[in-house]
Amino acid sequence: VVTSVPVLAADTVVQAGETVSGGTLTNHDNQIVLGTANGMTISTGLEYGPDNEANTGGQWIQNGGIANNTTVTGGGLQRVNAGGSVSDTVISAGGGQSLQGQAVNTTLNGGEQWVHEGGIATGTVINEKGWQAIKSGAVATDTVVNTGAEGGPDAENGDTGQTVYGDAVRTTINKNGRQIVAAEGTANTTVVYAGGDQTVHGHALDTTLNGGYQYVHNGGTASGTVVNSDGWQIVKNGGVAGNTTVN
């Protein structure tokens, strides 16, 4: 786990107690935030690819640091270390946020959010071709998923929508949205609307299907699912469903 970054001569450091506003990071620039950074645009940091520990550029939010209203464009990286917090980040396609601290109200417009062990993401909105990956030991709450199911029912498209290896709580899945709950993952209190679906290889608790679909695969368990009008629960060979209510 990376908790610090070497301070090079070309780096910009926002010291504790200091507030900066505006600016753009390009061409391997670093901004190391111990204070508060508002309204930054980040266009560098992913030179070695998504979620790669070798990446060194971009914006680094350290313990006690805060970043608000950040824009992350293609190739840009916002890294939030343990004890750091960010809010209202917008991430375009090709950009990413690596999260070990806290993030509130992130919008993924084709971008990616990787929530690592100890990280907490609240209120993320995942739009077309965006992806939220919740790793083991991480938590995402109140996520809205608007992408992932464009390939059709029960077609796992890879890195779009929401993939849960840790814990997802109170996720809303809208039309074209998909939540994939991996074998080690748990999804609690998910609501799935028409045109969206939940694919379960791990554990799904108290899912409500308001016209949406739930696929429980081999090894997956679904408990307390409520199937409302036009909803559909499909329990495959080796899958388990208990305490289902069909309306």
Predicted regions and their residues:
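Gram-negative bacterial Sec-dependent N-terminal signal peptides
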Residues: 1-6
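The right-handed parallel beta-helix/beta-solenoid scaffold, focusing on the short coil/turn
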Residues: 10, 16-23, 28-30, 35-40, ...
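Short, intrinsically disordered, charge-balanced linker/junction segments flanking boundaries
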Residues: 243-247
